[in-house]
Amino acid sequence: MCPQDVRTGGRHKDFLKKMSLQEFEDNVADCAQHGLRVVNLDGSGEATLNRNLPKYIEIVKKYGAKAFIFSNGYRMEGKFMRDCVDAGLDFYRFSWIGYDVEAYDKWMYNRIGGSFGSTWDKVKAMRQYVIDTNADCVVSTYHLITDNSKIEYELEHYKRIVNELDVKTEIWKMHNWSGVTDISETGVRQGAKKTCGRPFSPDVVIRAGGLDGQRGAVHPCCQVLGRDEEAVLGHTSKNTIEEIWEGEAYSKLRDDHRSGDYPSYCNDCDFLVDDPEVLVWTNHDRDLHHMHGTEFDLQDYRNAN
């Protein structure tokens, strides 16, 4: 469940911003110097709220990277959807928690932004447009098991959705977000705790907004949404990505992950849990620890020392 959910308090005030096109291009250009492969356009909120989203996609393509978006699909329909696909969008994932109307309303808590039925219609229309235009965009869904005692039951319902819509999917166990959300009712994950590998991997998260009027706050991963102020490692409005990566805050985080003395925003996160069955089912060519569109495996970085 997304920490932006009103039940968890959402993002901190200074992070309720949109990154300007120029700032975005400056950050993409900086990252491109270091071998940029994928830009995920959703790290600071619901991407489709940005009415200029196709322009951001065009910038990503200008620098030879893939453009990915994970979203609840709020405005991904009609001309806006077509413009995003035409701009070169490579991968779009609809977050869809809840295997029927009742479960969707409970877990997505998104009656204004969408519903089970409207999300179905958006996925279907986008998939059809990709087929009609022979676009390279992969349309995907993402589902969570809401009760670990009923995995097979929920899995079969999700599979029916995916098969009828003819899309790629990943179905995962429920996870928390750095301790923001209580998921005990779904069945707590069990396993040994170990670094998730993210502080060592070439995965950089740049947020719109920041602390004390600065912008481009860099976070260790996207899972710290909802604990925005605690997890800032630097700002691209002040330093380059390389300077932040090699800076004191990022270096300390890596030391903490080596020693197991995790900061509070990491300590309760399920991504530290070694649970080989967390990815319940997928029809996509995807490994548990392989980040979409990249050439690295997080498992390699979980063994960092």
Model-derived regions: residue spans:
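Short, well-ordered alpha-helical microsegments
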Residues: N50, M76-G78, I151, H219, ...
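Short glycine/proline- and charge-enriched loop/turn segments
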Residues: D5-R11, E102, T186-V188, K194
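Accessory C-terminal segments flanking Radical SAM cores
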Residues: E154-H157, D166-N305
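Soluble or luminal CAZymes and related metallo-dependent hydrolases
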Residues: M19-E23, N52, G114-D121, S149-H157, ...
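Conserved C-terminal portion of the radical SAM core fold
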Residues: H34-D42, K62-F70, V85-D100, G117-T186, ...
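Surface-exposed cleft-lining segments at the edges of enzyme active sites
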Residues: K13, D105-R111, H143, D182-Q190
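Conserved alpha-helical substructure of the radical SAM core
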Residues: M1-F91, K106-R111, G117, V273-N305
